[in-house]
Amino acid sequence: MIRTLIIATASAAALFSTPAVTQERSQGTASIPDLSGIWGNPYLYGIEPPLSGPGPVVNKARRRQAFDVDGRPLPAANAPFVSDARQLVGDYTNPILMPAAAEVVKKHAELSLAGVGYPSPRNQCWPQGVPFIFTNDAVQLLQQPDKITMLYDEDHEVRRVRMNQPHPAQVTPSWYGDSVGHYEGDTLVIDTVGFKIGPFSAVDQYGTPFTQALRVVERYRLIDHEAATKAWERGAKENARGGGGIGETWAPDPSYKGKALELQFTVEDKGVFTTAWSATKTYRRVSRDWPENVCAENPHKYGTEKDATVPIAGRPDF
């Protein structure tokens, strides 16, 4: 799999609060939404640009002709938006990027086009941080009155969100930042600042950097099946896996017509971006067993890039 490099650490202020799954809030009669469970999105990275307004850096190589196992091109009608899973060519012309950040993304794109792997938190087995961690296929939410715990499918990464509390006056930088949250009606809102700087840190898989000014605000809510289906169709065009498709582990149950989980997040960093930008990720409930994925065991390389010049860790660094 692949990761990226950049900078991180932050400080700011925020808000948040959490309740148990069916507990009623004292303010009003609205009940706490049940967001608990395992939620999956099988598309590679699964990030959907907004319908309007500033959006994230996207993969310029994502819309490539698909080929079958024998190397024959598939009809465009069958697979018009299939990526080459080995190429991560970030759109460095995106106007959200300041010149220095655009240059970083461009250099990563040139390496990828040349078939050269580059280090990232994912392929170097380092903490992914936020919002990079949203590129994981799945997340499990555990709701409690005073906190929310978020477990991600890759390498046992964990985030903890304190409910209804402010950020401390002095935030101690950490890999996942200081996260506080609250409910706004049917929506869980999480505000995160104070990110630690690491050698491979990045906002996304294209190497987009960040600074100590990084702030990420997440909004989670349940949406109906029809809205989720439309979102997944958009996600397929942006994020389809090379070869046609959907990962078996997190593929949705075709008979499931229940609620889906929508994540809308906003990213701001005055040291890197010209403006705040937003993106969405849409999850469906996962009924399969949660598989173990330990990066240091090197269970698989990114895509089919067996000759990548950047090796995946063969053993833990700790």
Residue ranges of model-derived segments:
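Hydrophobic helical h-region of N-terminal Sec-dependent signal peptides
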Residues: 7-15
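N-terminal signal peptide c-region/cleavage motif recognized by signal peptidases
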Residues: 17-19
